[in-house]
Amino acid sequence: MKHLIIVESPAKAKTIKNFLDKNYEVIASKGHVRDLSKFALGIKIDETGFTPNYVVDKDHKELVKQIIELSKKASTTYIATDEDREGEAIGYHVACLIGGELESYPRIVFHEITQNAILNALKTPRQIDMSKVNAQQARRFLDRIVGFKLSSLIASKITKGLSAGRVQSAALKLVIDREREIKAFKPLTYFTLDAYFEPHLEAQLISYKGNKLKAQELIDKKKAQEIKNELEKESYTISSIIKKSKKSPTPPPFMTSTLQQSASSLLGFSPTKTMSIAQKLYEGVATPQGVMGVITYMRTDSLNIAKEALEEARDKILKDYGKDYLPPKAKVYSSKNKNAQEAHEAIRPTSIILEPNALKDYLKPEELKLYTLIYKRFLASQMQDALFESQSVVVACEKGEFKASGRKLLFDGYYKILGNDDKDKLLPNLKENDPIKLEKLESNAHVTEPPARYSEASLIKVLESLGIGRPSTYAPTISLLQHRDYIKVEKKQISALESAFKVIEILEKHFEEIVDSKFSASLEEELDNIAQNKADYQQVLKDFYYPFMDKIEAGKKNIISQKVHEKTGQSCPKCGGELVKKNSRYGEFIACNNYPKCKYVKQTENANDGVKQELCEKCGGEMVQKFSRNGAFLACNNYPECKNTKSLKNTPNANEIIEGVKCPECGGDIALKRSRKGSFYGCNNYPKCNFLSNHKPIDKRCEKCHYLMSERIYRKKKAHECIQCKEHVFLEEDDG
């Protein structure tokens, strides 16, 4: 019988299959095979603890059946998902769905997808690490609880569609704080005195009459001019010349955050784009040696390097650059993050033999750019440091001192690979105590500038330094903030939108820990402790949940609604309050602004256009048009005393045929149908054909799976969505 290996992605499965013989079958889970319910909290919370309600997504049901069938036939089923917490959890869920004891599923891990790495992993399996699984579950539960409970509260107090989250809100707070700094900034004009001596020496005033000048200290233009006038009369000598040798240390190899930062600043890639390309390079691409992974795992906060890779790099440096560029021993780096998962490796090429030039005919241009960046950085990390000579010259007179600085490259070291953008600034040959002639003295005005807005790269750097999130969350967090219309990224600068200020103001006042970077970092440490079996994940959840829910309940009562409603100028007939226009998922309506104390609702005039008013046959009241998820209907305006309702004749009829669109299953007609749960679109050949869609089908095919598309509103935007694979395409809004 064959052995079964389960990985996450089809690309990874395809690459691994190339390395193994016929005795192995490789299948991809396509990410998580089950998750918390999308339509509810998905977690049962009681005195016994937190129990998840995991649901297999309908897109995964057939795949799960296939995995179970293959596993039953296999002599051994290997779990080969990624070696981070997310990968460990995916493997755990797959094993649970197959059934049986977890110990019966060997867990294999590897940091690169090469034949040697896969074969070695098969020789050294371990068991599924439940500490890692529990850490992932704790993170998932925390994110769901915060997102579900807090987002609902925020949306009810500001406007629908807004959200808050454990990591996203802490990141958004950083952006808002920077915006506040920029708005509060007041420019300062200050002056420097810049001297030009012969021959070709530029220097700046650093002290006057025995007093050291601080940066930006000279702010009085008149005073600056007076000092200039005095110093122009002085005679000058070379007071001191100091020369020092200084090393520029090699940079460490990349981890996730630094790769995203460098790819942003050097290649112009967004973090999301960087990770997408890196994923392809890791999972397998065409090379002269066949399809294989050309970089190690790209979601890592470790700077460890395998011994074999270090030896390869050192051999390469010695061969191509000579012994002067090779340090006496391999360089070892450690992450500043004390909780870095050191079992992982830094991001490096899987084979130093695969130079970028050797792959230029195999990789796409953007793939080659990122691979080149990773390759050069890794090789440079094992070279000698660059060596500079720094020079400092002080020119003095009786009343002041001027200072000039210079730098000269003595040995290029790792610059041989990475290059050096800093040009040498050479000072003329001078001798101490020699006189020097002042050629010109200028008083120059400067204006301070506000703090720069974050770029995606600099925000990731701050998130990492503060311990907010993990390598796998940086790019998705920024993408989520953009998608929620909290931030926009233009010309590499992140700016906050108005809704972001409102959300953060509420969170700062009522949920300060959610936006507190220290709290977020401490929670990450708790998750790390769970992963290392130093903390119980149920207890960590309890410690967070109950105080948090107390604040949610308090927020419902105490947070003042910031929703803006258009005034009608009319008074409420029930309590005398003011009637305002409001919106719900069913349309616009008029209601009393004293809600919830007064629950009077009046339908808007627009909603009644074209609808004949009737008298209620039960109480004599007026029948007015209202809306529900099933469409428009007539209801008595004396509700709740009278609950009479009546369907509208001009409501779209059930079984109304959708013109120009045929059933993708049998070619029959598709019609609008109704049930007690609402309207839907189904095939007229039911029950012989079971095709149905919650959204209106259109005469268009999905580019991904070629199934029928539908039109819908997705995340507040018009979109076409595949009825089968759920691939969606946002539609461009008309400018007019």
Give a label for each model feature.
Residues 214-252, 434:
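Metal- or metallocofactor-binding catalytic centers and their adjacent structured scaffolds
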Residues 241, 250-263, 289-298, 450-462:
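Short acidic, hydrophobic short linear motifs in intrinsically disordered regions
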Residues 282-296, 484-492:
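A short, conserved structural fragment
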Residues 1, 82-83, 159-163, 243-252, ...:
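Conserved short loop/turn motifs at secondary-structure junctions
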Residues 1-140, 149, 218, 423:
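Intrinsically disordered, low-complexity regulatory segments
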Residues 117-197:
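C-terminal or mid-to-C-terminal helical accessory/interaction module adjacent to the motor/catalytic core
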Residues 275-279, 478-479:
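Short, hydrophobic-biased segments on the C-terminal half of alpha helices
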Residues 2-3, 15, 22-24, 97, ...:
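Basic, low-complexity terminal or inter-domain segments flanking catalytic cores
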